[in-house]
Amino acid sequence: MYKRQAVNRSLLIDPHGEIVARYDKIHMFDVDLAEGESYRESNAFRPGGRAVLVETPWGVLGMTVCYDLRFPHLYRGLAQAGADFLAIPSAFTVPTGNAHWHVLLRARAIENGCFVFAPAQWGEHAEGRRTYGHSLIVDPWGEVLADAGEGVGIVTARINLAAIANARRMVPSLQHDRPFTKPELAARPLAAE
Protein backbone atom coordinates (compact mmCIF):
# COMPACT_ATOMS: atom_id res chain seq x y z
CA MET A 1 0.00 0.00 0.00
CA TYR A 2 2.76 2.47 0.88
CA LYS A 3 4.82 3.01 -2.25
CA ARG A 4 7.57 5.16 -0.78
CA GLN A 5 9.68 5.05 2.34
CA ALA A 6 9.70 8.79 3.07
CA VAL A 7 7.97 9.95 6.25
CA ASN A 8 6.20 13.16 7.23
CA ARG A 9 8.37 14.00 10.24
CA SER A 10 8.27 16.63 12.96
CA LEU A 11 11.50 17.45 14.77
CA LEU A 12 12.13 19.08 18.13
CA ILE A 13 15.41 20.99 18.07
CA ASP A 14 17.08 22.31 21.22
CA PRO A 15 18.67 25.78 21.59
CA HIS A 16 22.04 24.31 20.49
CA GLY A 17 20.62 23.08 17.18
CA GLU A 18 20.55 19.42 18.21
CA ILE A 19 17.60 17.19 17.33
CA VAL A 20 16.21 15.94 20.64
CA ALA A 21 13.05 14.21 19.39
CA ARG A 22 11.42 13.14 16.15
CA TYR A 23 7.88 12.07 15.38
CA ASP A 24 6.70 10.39 12.18
CA LYS A 25 3.09 11.19 11.31
CA ILE A 26 0.86 8.19 12.02
CA HIS A 27 -2.31 9.03 10.06
CA MET A 28 -2.04 9.58 6.29
CA PHE A 29 -4.24 12.24 4.66
CA ASP A 30 -5.98 10.11 2.01
CA VAL A 31 -9.24 11.99 1.34
CA ASP A 32 -11.67 13.06 -1.35
CA LEU A 33 -13.00 16.54 -0.62
CA ALA A 34 -15.72 18.46 -2.44
CA GLU A 35 -15.37 19.62 -6.04
CA GLY A 36 -12.84 16.94 -6.99
CA GLU A 37 -10.18 18.00 -4.49
CA SER A 38 -8.38 14.76 -3.62
CA TYR A 39 -5.22 13.92 -1.66
CA ARG A 40 -3.30 10.66 -1.27
CA GLU A 41 -0.50 11.26 1.19
CA SER A 42 0.18 7.51 1.29
CA ASN A 43 1.41 7.74 -2.32
CA ALA A 44 4.41 9.72 -1.11
CA PHE A 45 4.83 8.77 2.55
CA ARG A 46 4.61 5.76 4.82
CA PRO A 47 2.97 6.20 8.23
CA GLY A 48 4.82 6.19 11.50
CA GLY A 49 3.67 3.86 14.23
CA ARG A 50 4.79 5.38 17.52
CA ALA A 51 3.50 8.27 19.60
CA VAL A 52 6.25 10.53 20.99
CA LEU A 53 6.60 12.39 24.28
CA VAL A 54 9.61 14.50 25.20
CA GLU A 55 10.56 16.21 28.45
CA THR A 56 11.15 19.96 28.15
CA PRO A 57 12.18 22.52 30.79
CA TRP A 58 8.49 23.55 31.05
CA GLY A 59 6.77 20.16 30.97
CA VAL A 60 6.14 17.19 28.72
CA LEU A 61 5.48 17.76 25.00
CA GLY A 62 3.43 15.37 22.86
CA MET A 63 4.37 15.53 19.18
CA THR A 64 1.92 14.97 16.31
CA VAL A 65 1.42 16.21 12.74
CA CYS A 66 -1.56 17.68 10.85
CA TYR A 67 -4.21 15.02 10.04
CA ASP A 68 -3.38 13.25 13.33
CA LEU A 69 -5.54 16.03 14.82
CA ARG A 70 -8.66 14.11 13.73
CA PHE A 71 -7.83 11.10 15.92
CA PRO A 72 -8.65 12.10 19.51
CA HIS A 73 -7.50 8.79 21.00
CA LEU A 74 -3.90 9.69 20.02
CA TYR A 75 -4.10 12.90 22.08
CA ARG A 76 -5.83 11.19 24.99
CA GLY A 77 -3.02 8.64 25.03
CA LEU A 78 -0.39 11.38 25.01
CA ALA A 79 -2.13 13.24 27.85
CA GLN A 80 -2.60 10.07 29.90
CA ALA A 81 1.12 9.36 29.45
CA GLY A 82 2.00 12.81 30.82
CA ALA A 83 1.75 15.41 28.04
CA ASP A 84 1.24 19.00 29.20
CA PHE A 85 1.65 20.46 25.71
CA LEU A 86 0.63 19.19 22.28
CA ALA A 87 2.53 20.24 19.16
CA ILE A 88 0.54 19.93 15.92
CA PRO A 89 2.40 21.44 12.93
CA SER A 90 -0.03 21.34 10.01
CA ALA A 91 -0.90 22.15 6.43
CA PHE A 92 -4.71 22.05 6.56
CA THR A 93 -6.37 22.81 3.24
CA VAL A 94 -8.54 25.92 3.02
CA PRO A 95 -11.83 23.94 2.95
CA THR A 96 -10.92 21.74 5.93
CA GLY A 97 -9.29 24.63 7.78
CA ASN A 98 -12.33 26.88 7.44
CA ALA A 99 -14.61 24.15 8.69
CA HIS A 100 -12.55 22.34 11.33
CA TRP A 101 -9.15 23.84 12.30
CA HIS A 102 -10.13 26.03 15.25
CA VAL A 103 -12.75 23.68 16.68
CA LEU A 104 -10.53 20.58 16.54
CA LEU A 105 -7.57 22.34 18.15
CA ARG A 106 -9.75 23.77 20.90
CA ALA A 107 -11.33 20.35 21.46
CA ARG A 108 -7.93 18.63 21.82
CA ALA A 109 -6.85 21.31 24.34
CA ILE A 110 -10.08 21.09 26.34
CA GLU A 111 -10.53 17.32 26.44
CA ASN A 112 -6.93 16.75 27.54
CA GLY A 113 -6.25 19.83 29.67
CA CYS A 114 -3.18 20.69 27.57
CA PHE A 115 -1.74 23.71 25.84
CA VAL A 116 -1.82 23.29 22.06
CA PHE A 117 0.84 24.77 19.80
CA ALA A 118 -0.23 24.55 16.16
CA PRO A 119 2.07 26.16 13.58
CA ALA A 120 0.27 26.13 10.24
CA GLN A 121 1.34 26.45 6.62
CA TRP A 122 -0.40 29.18 4.62
CA GLY A 123 -0.51 29.97 0.93
CA GLU A 124 -0.93 28.65 -2.60
CA HIS A 125 1.07 25.62 -3.67
CA ALA A 126 1.63 23.27 -6.60
CA GLU A 127 -1.39 21.91 -8.45
CA GLY A 128 -3.69 24.55 -6.94
CA ARG A 129 -3.47 23.33 -3.35
CA ARG A 130 -4.22 26.14 -0.88
CA THR A 131 -3.40 25.93 2.82
CA TYR A 132 -5.37 27.65 5.54
CA GLY A 133 -2.77 29.18 7.84
CA HIS A 134 -3.99 30.40 11.24
CA SER A 135 -1.12 29.21 13.43
CA LEU A 136 -2.66 28.98 16.90
CA ILE A 137 -1.77 28.73 20.56
CA VAL A 138 -4.66 27.40 22.66
CA ASP A 139 -4.79 27.12 26.45
CA PRO A 140 -6.10 24.08 28.39
CA TRP A 141 -9.52 25.73 28.83
CA GLY A 142 -9.85 26.12 25.05
CA GLU A 143 -9.13 29.84 24.83
CA VAL A 144 -7.22 30.87 21.72
CA LEU A 145 -4.26 32.87 23.05
CA ALA A 146 -2.78 33.69 19.63
CA ASP A 147 -3.92 33.34 16.01
CA ALA A 148 -1.64 34.30 13.10
CA GLY A 149 -4.57 34.57 10.71
CA GLU A 150 -3.80 34.33 7.01
CA GLY A 151 -0.35 35.22 5.77
CA VAL A 152 3.19 34.69 6.94
CA GLY A 153 3.80 35.39 10.60
CA ILE A 154 4.89 34.24 14.02
CA VAL A 155 2.65 33.78 17.03
CA THR A 156 3.68 34.06 20.64
CA ALA A 157 1.75 34.04 23.88
CA ARG A 158 2.52 34.27 27.55
CA ILE A 159 1.37 31.01 29.10
CA ASN A 160 0.55 30.21 32.69
CA LEU A 161 1.71 26.67 33.48
CA ALA A 162 -0.73 26.53 36.41
CA ALA A 163 -3.55 26.59 33.84
CA ILE A 164 -2.85 22.91 33.10
CA ALA A 165 -3.47 21.75 36.68
CA ASN A 166 -6.39 24.18 37.07
CA ALA A 167 -8.19 22.89 33.96
CA ARG A 168 -7.58 19.26 34.94
CA ARG A 169 -8.80 19.91 38.48
CA MET A 170 -12.01 21.66 37.37
CA VAL A 171 -12.85 19.07 34.70
CA PRO A 172 -10.92 15.89 35.56
CA SER A 173 -11.69 14.02 32.34
CA LEU A 174 -8.28 12.31 32.30
CA GLN A 175 -9.07 10.78 35.70
CA HIS A 176 -12.64 9.94 34.73
CA ASP A 177 -11.75 8.28 31.43
CA ARG A 178 -12.65 4.61 31.54
CA PRO A 179 -11.95 1.72 29.20
CA PHE A 180 -14.94 0.23 27.44
CA THR A 181 -15.82 -2.51 25.02
CA LYS A 182 -16.49 -1.26 21.52
CA PRO A 183 -20.15 -1.69 20.65
CA GLU A 184 -21.52 -4.19 18.19
CA LEU A 185 -24.59 -3.59 16.07
CA ALA A 186 -27.61 -5.33 17.59
CA ALA A 187 -28.37 -8.59 15.76
CA ARG A 188 -32.00 -7.68 15.22
CA PRO A 189 -32.93 -4.13 14.23
CA LEU A 190 -35.71 -2.30 16.01
CA ALA A 191 -38.96 -2.21 14.11
CA ALA A 192 -40.06 1.19 12.82
CA GLU A 193 -43.54 2.26 13.83
Region spans (language model):
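Active-site loops and adjacent core secondary-structure elements that bind or stabilize anionic groups
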Residues: 1
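Short beta-strand-to-turn element immediately C-terminal to the catalytic PLP-Schiff-base lysine
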Residues: 12-14, 138-139, 157-158
